[in-house]
């Protein structure tokens, strides 16, 4: 079967283009001269492709005039001329006439019914859709959708009874019109048509009724109605036919959507009124009415804008915008606009977005070519002055340099080639010289210094052309001399041989690309090539013609080549530009930018949508001069881009559509008259420099934005730029909203910014277009994608309108028409929520398509009913051919195959619901098998009469022969018995014609095409597929890198009929297509007449594998992927048997209005693409910039990834590279240790996408959370054929379909695996390479010396960045050094520590997830050794204190309990923050701490070539390993130069010491391993401790005490004063917390417990629940609360509920909503965000440190606050914990409660409770004191000594007598606390004297502390709280250590037993 999917020779993007763009500017449909031909010809004009011209313009064309004269001869007077606005109403009246005709002739009946009556009853069609929807979710069987659809269609028929007949009529007319030439040849016709068609002269006459006749010529249609004739040009007729079909689609779809109550769909009456609105305008105003129609889009946008907050709008919301667009309208026109505004007033944003797509429903105006020329000339010939010298231009050029240079540095870590003035000493220059990152906030940064930066040659120009880009079959302009010759001979401008680019290419020998561009840059284009044709744009709404440019061949080469250079090399440094972004990237970017619009509380985000007046034509040389010069310098060719406007000025411009008379001129080619031909036009041309001018526009915007505050984000391409600006404010009222004053200030800021934009662009000669430039706080719109307050708006109507088979642009075969419909359906599905209505539209048009095929096929002459019915078709069963005679083709059976037989199984290829659901599913065969198998079963369930058809259809049979070319082309294809289709046959025609072509001036191209001759290509396919097992993906990649792929791609590009005509004298393409089409239709009619070789019963994965093996005769690896629709089943109710192995789903809201029009709490899943985890070598990446080498280079990554180097397969993989260059491929092969990731999962082929994205509006996904983490059976790490993106998308889609059908589900769902055979292990070829290795070695074609496909190494140049990378690898010797392959913990810790420090400094950027994964793997103490050692070297080389360091990577690795303890206790770093919310450190503190630390032993290091900064790694190794080098000045200088990169000139495994020190005995240990491959070696217990001793970390002088003294002046301490150790100590006291929970549960006996979803807390609660006894009549509800989950966040947590006791006393809930009501609700460890959910009377258990964080958010009525109302008694209760930390139980606004203490507790805790009841403020202080002083409490001598060690370590024995005031506050307070504790603990303490303590005298040299007292006896108020605290603590404890008071007051000796006072060093304390 020849599938229509992407082949290996076709260009393939990562996904379908996200842009809904116009056709390529170089593509046009030129009217070619008709030729007499005895063969069949293809009309091709089934829909309007060109702009409409007036009758006078058309008569200037001699062909049209000649056809008109012939028609008059044949039929006489042509009658009334129907204008373009009258044709549609005329055809509608004619359709109504036929619909009401009762003559009942076969033709009339056929037109009346068409394909609409093929399915017997509309209820039958609806049942088909219900069964199809049931394949997604079985619950749709009882949804009642069939009744709804049938009812909606019935209403449509009632209100529009004649529309179906009109559609059928125009479809039949279009077929006849496009086959006029064939009917003239008396070809066979369908009997119904044959009886009603005759030929009169050269005119085809169709007799519809007695009084209705239609006359068709090639360019004019005439209708005779009751003796009155009406004529219209073909273009007018096509225009009307398009709109009739579009209106049918729009109105029918509106009825369906309204019937199904799809949220956001506009009411049908509004759709009809809007259509009538436009019709009435055109009826009243004629063609001029399009001036009003053209404002429809802007008006709809303006209505949406009018909903903005007027207080924030810089204008008046949408009001000013609506007024601006009406400025040029008269009163009558303005009234029309006002009426439209009134119509739209009550519509929601979703409805308005949908209606926005109707802007082409009123067809197109007749263009005014002369007016368009004058308007164009007015713009292009206006004088603008010297724009380049203006300050705004200088600012913009500086902005370009800034953006480019800084982004270049970010991507490469070095600057591009830059020249600076020798004597300049500016900050920017110094950063560039020293390769330091430019900090724009630096005090010395000066924006104007960018003027000093001269860019150099950063980019190289490739040697070779991309021949496939050149082969685009687009229109060009003849040269001047060719135009002169052509005008002299024919007086016309049409000549396909001169106007088709590919024909010109075949006749022109090209010099290499670099040579060509060098010639143009130095000398410009030859004057003969300076010519530009202007061709009117099609399908516009503007009356004044707009033109795109047709360039001469060489001019086109110049502009396309230079634009391609910008796109491939420069554009990547401007991420704001989205011209090359894929769909997923754009959706993510638009979603991110628009999400800021959701809330405008603390900040306001504005969307500024900019459009420019004649953007292309405003681009003058003076506007672009600064940029063009800079770009030229970047490519090393002055003049490369600067030549652009000189070429424009030198060019002669002419109107190229043939409607204007051109006079030949021997000097200029065409005589200049300044009307239709002119010169000296230096302005830009439409679409010629899009990328260049887009870059410049971005720089303009950036230049303005830098002067204004706010956060800016830009997205755009071309003249449509969308900017979001966010302003923050602190002017918030008590409700959390921005105050009026705050709004006013923000509005003033944005208004000032917009004014600055307008002023800047006006000065730059690029005025903004008022009618399309607007500012909004709600609407984000880019390229027809709309978001309102962050919500993507559904808008399918535009795509739905084009759902008809004749909108196809290729040959009108069954497959191409079906795929055209399928493409339109997928596009519409992307902008729709529910696909049910679209399925109905598909069935309608699929039925019509079946009717077209049998009754009025576009290839009518060869496919008629008689030939189909009397033919013979061949099917194959058991590899034996069977001839089947076709007696009669069953229309219903054909329609069912069109609708439901997927293309992968031999069908026409119309889409089903599975294919509409997502994009990117990798195996369409398995998907198709699953669909058909389930669909046939559900048809039986719904009682469909068509179930027997589908039962026979659900199977495949295989071809009797095997040719592996289709499999290699499409790796998923099957070898079916399907004949080659018409479209497939079309592929062979260009190939045959090119080989026989009479053209061939381009010898290099002729030589390339010559390899298609002979049997060599077939032999290659036989050889490459000769293995016993087919590793088809690798085979595909190999083949796509050969010259055969180049030639096949070239032939596929030659697809224009007119082009093919000129290639050979004999043209019989249509006969070949028609013959293939006839065979295919006959085949479809008999396909299922006999039982297939394989019928679809059972697992689709097994069936797919069987089909592949049986069809191809060999097993096929790596392509079979089961669809989740097969093996996943949602359990919609709680009554299911759960195997605890499932995907977990949570639904936050099921109201379909809410879910589709508002964002939910979850981040919507937009899909994902998998990425390859490793890169090519630097050398391979450098050579890959040459297009000729890129594909063959890319497949070299497969070596050592899929196949080992040295194997036969590796040599075959290298062969395509050897065929195109003389470079040794071995240099490009990556080492096996660097490869990472599975090939089947990670490899991105050019033939399919790896990943998947939803193909529907994603708003409902924000209300769904899904986790695959609970699918334990298929956990991460297993190599299985699961497509997880599809699992997520398809599961969510099932829920959406149910929601849209008003079928609700539980909030929590389980998705279980229902098929145990679908998922299987992926087979790896490494297990047995002999099976996949070809038995015959293929021969690869090569053309040495052909510059199109062969490049010698000496001809290749590199970009500067590539040169630096390759040169770096060469200079450090990393390419050929000796490496170790046995990795261990040394390599793991060396690499991880180096990578961390590289990220800290900013050399690299690893994802956060990588570091988070290392938290539990690493030994933090061991890692600290490496970090400290590397830091010593880094600090010695440059001043890191002045470098912006990001310690985030280090903190992420250490974000665990043990990690924080190592940071704090071992490394002395003060860590703040929380483990959950992120740690933070002071940069100076961490730098000082690391500097002060020393290690007793340097850990062993290794050098990893896979990590960055290899030379710095090597230098670090030498400095750490050989410390003696630091004492040799020569060695030190060598290493310093090596570090800086100035002396990198030797192998890294050589001895780098000087000649005297070097002995050659040592060298670094070198490895080359991906960091992920070393993770398993991050051991925590190091073996051989005798050999490898861990050094001890000693504290430096800057080591701080970690306790912080809390200020007691305020009621609450600042939460910032709480260190991370306090928090960890509090949270790590698991036993204390469990005891506390037990006490609380026993005390309160709660009926509801609310807890956060943390594993540890859930486990503690589970154990408590097992112990606690509940009242027999009670039931405990455990409510697990999750806030704002993403789709994968909560996986493992969901499963914790299984661990709770399983009996009727416990009920575990998991909900996003408010917890259930209860008498006693208990919140365990609530977070800040959940406190607001607590009700009056709820009880909270909060750790005290968290309470400090949250106390501001607790309501003022809570008794814990000082400011409180007079309410009844509250209770505050604390239990003692380890470390003196506490948990708090707080009853929140509770009623009076009498508490009895049921459990024993200490007397201290009782005291606290009493105090808290009496005075909560003092009680709170007491708890703070307990936390602060707990370290100084002691009962034993050992505890006293531990407390003393804390003080002892803080004393500096420097021999100087100091007092406590010389210490920091922390030290002073610690000493005071310690002394007070000892004093209050002493025997016979004199409390009155102790309380007069004044200060403590410290004698560091004696290690003695002496308390000093106030002689006056005044009590020390400062320390009163400490005295009070220790008095109460020690009053409840019996002393176990005797401390004499008399000794203590003399002093406390911490280490000297010989001094006076109390000595801790002696056993009894005596001195």
UniProtKB/Swiss-Prot annotation:
Superkingdom of the source species: Viruses
- Indicate whether Nucleotide-binding appears among the record's keywords: yes
Q: Name one GO cellular component term.
A: virion component
**TM segment ranges:** none
Catalytic activity as recorded in UniProt = RNA(n) + a ribonucleoside 5'-triphosphate = RNA(n+1) + diphosphate; a 5'-end (5'-triphosphoguanosine)-adenylyl-adenylyl-cytidylyl-adenosine in mRNA + 2 S-adenosyl-L-methionine = a 5'-end (N(7)-methyl 5'-triphosphoguanosine)-(2'-O-methyladenylyl)-adenylyl-cytidylyl-adenosine in mRNA + 2 S-adenosyl-L-homocysteine + H(+); a 5'-end (5'-triphosphoguanosine)-adenylyl-adenylyl-cytidylyl-adenosine in mRNA + S-adenosyl-L-methionine = a 5'-end (5'-triphosphoguanosine)-(2'-O-methyladenylyl)-adenylyl-cytidylyl-adenosine in mRNA + S-adenosyl-L-homocysteine + H(+); a 5'-end triphospho-adenylyl-adenylyl-cytidylyl-adenosine in mRNA + GDP + H(+) = a 5'-end (5'-triphosphoguanosine)-adenylyl-adenylyl-cytidylyl-adenosine in mRNA + diphosphate
- Name the predominant localization: virion
Can you give the residue ranges of the RdRp catalytic domain?
604-790
The places in or outside the cell where this protein is found are:
Virion; Host cytoplasm
Keyword Cell inner membrane among record annotations: no
What InterPro entries does the annotation carry?
Answer: L_poly_C, Mononeg_mRNAcap, Mononeg_RNA_pol_cat
Question: Which EC number applies?
Answer: 2.7.7.48, 3.6.1.-, 2.7.7.88, 2.1.1.375
Q: Which UniProt keywords apply?
A: ATP-binding, Host cytoplasm, Hydrolase, Methyltransferase, mRNA capping, mRNA processing, Multifunctional enzyme, Nucleotide-binding, Nucleotidyltransferase, RNA-directed RNA polymerase, S-adenosyl-L-methionine, Transferase, Viral RNA replication, Virion
- Give the record's family classification: Belongs to the rhabdoviridae protein L family.
What the protein does comes down to: RNA-directed RNA polymerase that catalyzes the transcription of viral mRNAs, their capping and polyadenylation. The template is composed of the viral RNA tightly encapsidated by the nucleoprotein (N). The viral polymerase binds to the genomic RNA at the 3' leader promoter, and transcribes subsequently all viral mRNAs with a decreasing efficiency. The first gene is the most transcribed, and the last the least transcribed. The viral phosphoprotein acts as a processivity factor. Capping is concomitant with initiation of mRNA transcription. RNA-directed RNA polymerase that catalyzes the replication of viral genomic RNA. The template is composed of the viral RNA tightly encapsidated by the nucleoprotein (N). The replicase mode is dependent on intracellular N protein concentration. In this mode, the polymerase replicates the whole viral genome without recognizing transcriptional signals, and the replicated genome is not caped or polyadenylated.
Q: How does it assemble?
A: May form homodimer. Interacts with the P protein.
What protein name applies here? RNA-directed RNA polymerase L
Gene from which this protein is expressed: L
